[in-house]
Amino acid sequence: MSGHSKFANIKHKKEKNDAAKGKIFTMIGRELAVAVKEGGPDPANNFKLAQVVAKAKANNMPNDTIERGIKKAAGDGNSVNYETATYEGYGPSGTAIIVKCLTDNKNRTAANVRNAFTKGQGSIGTQGCVSYMFDEKGQIIIDKEECDMDADDLMMQALDAGAEDFADEDDSYEITTAPADFDAVRAALEEAGITMASAEVTMIPQTYVTLTDEADITNIGRILDLLDDDDDVQEVYHNWEE
């Protein structure tokens, strides 16, 4: 993913080493369980599940692991009951941060998220205090090294399938879709044999904040690192232009 890309930087992601990949698989496993319980085990009839499966594949989760996760969620009435929880708040200099969690203990999660903000000189706000600064969009990132298709052909393939935008970055192509068109665009690219580095519905900031003060940069890094280390945290979105 391009280090200079705004889209690539909207979410603070863990490095994909072996330990981090294990955490990512655990997080996706929780998402699969919640999606199946909410809408059933068939991705064709469960849009949320289809999104999670796409995310799992983009993170190289083996198909048999995905299938086992779906079957377990569909047939195991004694599995852990995870609930969704979303927190919004402010980092240094008014940076906006959204934290999405899946948890079996909302009190624990709320305390941990609040602690992360506090340690980075930030603050938790009320629901909706920063989400209006973001747009929900489908986002597909393709590494140029993994793509044999010409950029123009790839762009036409994506736009014909319903994509809103196509960006040619330093070392990646980035495709943006409306949430409702995401699955169709992803499926069209998959059918064309395109390998995707990531594919998910995400939150894209409408504007970005540049931090110049070293203390602010240290503090927002502390917030994001603490949130990354929390197993209950699934996604973190922010408008800091790293």
Swiss-Prot record:
GO biological process: regulation of DNA-templated transcription
GO molecular-function term, one example from the UniProt record: DNA binding
Compartment annotation: Cytoplasm
One GO CC annotation: cytosol
SUPFAM superfamilies: YebC-like
Keywords, comma-separated and alphabetical: Cytoplasm, DNA-binding, Transcription, Transcription regulation
UniProt-listed Pfam families: TACO1_YebC_N, Transcrip_reg
Gene3D superfamilies according to UniProt: 1.10.10.200, 3.30.70.980
Family per record: Belongs to the TACO1 family.
Name of the protein: Probable transcriptional regulatory protein EUBREC_1961
Organism lineage string: Bacteria, Bacillati, Bacillota, Clostridia, Lachnospirales
